[in-house]
């Protein structure tokens, strides 16, 4: 199955599919600790096998390219939340600044690698990392974390977070808000801009929850896919693409 995410990227700054069924009750208290991920997580559409307790997906394209069906969504895995392993390369995702929830940093060199743009979620996210990286001649968009081992089977939860996005070579950050109905298996949310360089009408995401993953329907104007992370679905994160507004990015949010 080919994931339908079309991302127009000229700047990039930081979805695993499991068979974990819904269980547990409707406890809506925000959990504090990451859950133990299942030992074996089946690969998603990418087809490549990975190792590590932190799982997710990434898209890698030559800088300035438009992501389309010819670009594969890659499974990614790591034993360190702050390490991104993709295409045989390793990137340090440890936030440069410890304050706030998402940071944009124009770092030029780190661990022997050069960067033009480095945008990654911060320590508010205990179980996941997401964002963009532009390094060398390649652009990266990614989301990874500790997949929720036991999903709530009922209850409604609110999630508040941030997003990083790009359009026509301009990158920016914004806010994300989601409502998860675990009994109805629905996730509905909105991404809004806080950036003066990238403005757009709110992006609406309407997805179906399947195990600890969620995805929009095929052919939706806004395509998105992602996962719940941590104990009791404490966090969520994923990728999105709005083909009408030619906008794409990654997002994360924390259960309130």
Locations of regions flagged by a protein language model:
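Bacterial N-terminal signal peptides that target proteins for export
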Residues: 1-9
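C-terminal motif of bacterial Sec signal peptides marking the signal peptidase cleavage site
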Residues: 16-19
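Mature soluble binding/inhibitory domains
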Residues: 21-256
């Amino acid at each position: 199955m080919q994931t339908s995410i079309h991302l127009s990227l000229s700047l990039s700054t930081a979805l695993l599919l499991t068979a974990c069924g819904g269980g547990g009750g409707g406890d809506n208290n925000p959990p504090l600790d990451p859950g133990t991920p299942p030992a074996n997580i089946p690969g998603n559409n990418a087809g490549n096998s990975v190792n590590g307790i932190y799982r997710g997906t990434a898209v890698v394209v030559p800088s300035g390219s438009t992501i389309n069906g010819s670009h594969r969504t890659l499974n990614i895995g790591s034993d360190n939340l702050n390490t991104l392993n993709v295409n045989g390369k390793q990137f340090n995702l440890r936030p440069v600044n410890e304050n706030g929830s998402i940071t944009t940093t124009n770092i030029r060199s780190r661990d022997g690698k050069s960067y033009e743009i480095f945008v990654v979620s911060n320590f508010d996210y205990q179980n996941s990392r997401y964002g963009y990286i532009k390094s060398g001649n390649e652009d990266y968009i990614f989301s990874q974390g500790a997949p929720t081992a036991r999903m709530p089977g009922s209850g409604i939860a609110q999630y508040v977070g941030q997003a990083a996005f790009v359009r026509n070579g301009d990158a920016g950050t914004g806010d994300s808000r989601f409502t998860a109905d675990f009994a109805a298996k629905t996730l509905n949310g909105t991404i809004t801009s806080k950036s003066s360089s990238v403005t757009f009408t709110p992006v609406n995401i309407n997805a179906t929850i399947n195990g600890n993953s969620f995805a929009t329907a095929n052919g939706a104007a806004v395509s998105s896919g992602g996962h719940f992370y941590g104990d009791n679905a404490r966090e969520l994160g994923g990728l999105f693409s709005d083909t009408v507004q030619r906008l794409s990015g990654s997002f994360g949010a924390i259960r309130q």
